[in-house]
Amino acid sequence: MLVISIVATILVSCTTETENGGFSLEKVNDTLYNVVLETDSSRDVWELRFPVYRFCTGDMDGDSIVDAVVGVEKTTRFDPVVRRRVFMFRNIEGKVRPLWMGSRLGRPVVDFNVVNVDGETRLRSVEEDDNGKFLVAEYRWSSFGVKFIRYICRDFEFDDSMEILNNE
């Protein structure tokens, strides 16, 4: 149980809210994680049967309720290659429910973070560009899924892109 607590603490480090909205991540084993939502009166779990590389929280859809953003490594029906994907979950009356189960962003995802830009919560990602270099892009929620906003940088080396992701 101590290992679960340590993993959750490390992965929650990109939280943009002062509180995580009751969301946390429990590692059961290398390929089984639980997105957990705890309120004063209930505990709900959404099982993820994939490796998780990132866990963040923030009000992604602008409804003033904190959402969970989870990076998973998996295939999809239309892409048989294991890649990094981004899933979003919301709190519906104390239950964990999918908000968006994204198969990809603009380019293959390397990593992401949840950031606050001028009072708006956004998804910021490092993606691998077609030329083998890396870019940092920003997305916002748009009715069903995320909408591209802007490139923060393009044609950067991996380390430089990750530094921008983690320091802005």
Regions found by a protein language model. Give the residues of each.
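Beta-propeller-forming repeat regions
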Residues: 13-168
